UniProtKB/Swiss-Prot annotation:
Subunit: Part of the 50S ribosomal subunit. Contacts protein L32.
Keywords in alphabetical order: Ribonucleoprotein, Ribosomal protein
Encoding gene (name): rplQ
Protein name (database record): Large ribosomal subunit protein bL17
Annotated GO biological process: translation
Family statement: Belongs to the bacterial ribosomal protein bL17 family.
GO cellular component term, pick one: cytosolic large ribosomal subunit
InterPro entries: Ribosomal_bL17, Ribosomal_bL17_CS, Ribosomal_bL17_sf
Species of the source: Finegoldia magna (strain ATCC 29328 / DSM 20472 / WAL 2508)
Molecular-function annotations in GO: structural constituent of ribosome
Length: 131
């Protein structure tokens, strides 16, 4: 089995944290986290995008085993995966930010390459209402 970073957590806590990081990445297009967490989340995100590129029913069910929100899986298969149809891996990028102020841990931004998040009509209405 491939080496896995333990991240100072029990197995169930670690897998839940990585699932949440990947889910947030697909919802927002980018997330800010520590470098070690980003490297682990990147592994899982790349696997999920590869499943999204397959696009069949079994791939969708496999993705639902890892990502619990159906709307995030829909976004993955319908919006994110088609962007990477001609790309053979390297769907994410890690941009280092520098040390965190409290404890000096190296922080970074994990983002999807060549993907711009589409704003829904609800988000546009709230932006207009705020102005």
């Amino acid at each position: 089995m491939a080496n896995l970073r333990k991240l100072g957590r029990r197995t169930d806590h670690r897998t839940a944290m990585l699932r949440n990081l990947v889910q947030s990445l697909f919802e927002n297009g980018k997330i800010e986290t520590t470098v070690t967490r980003a490297k682990e989340a990147r592994r899982e995100a790349e696997k999920m995008i590869t499943l999204g590129k397959k696009g069949d029913l079994s791939a969708r069910r496999e993705a639902l085993k890892y990502i619990y929100k159906k709307d995030v899986v829909y976004t993955l298969f319908e919006e994110i995966a088609p962007v990477y149809a001609d790309r053979q891996g390297g769907y994410t990028r890690i941009l280092k930010l520098g040390p965190r102020r409290g404890d000096g841990t190296e922080m970074c931004i994990l983002e999807l390459v060549d993907y711009t998040k589409k704003e829904s009509s609800e988000e546009k209405e709230t932006v207009k209402a705020d102005k």
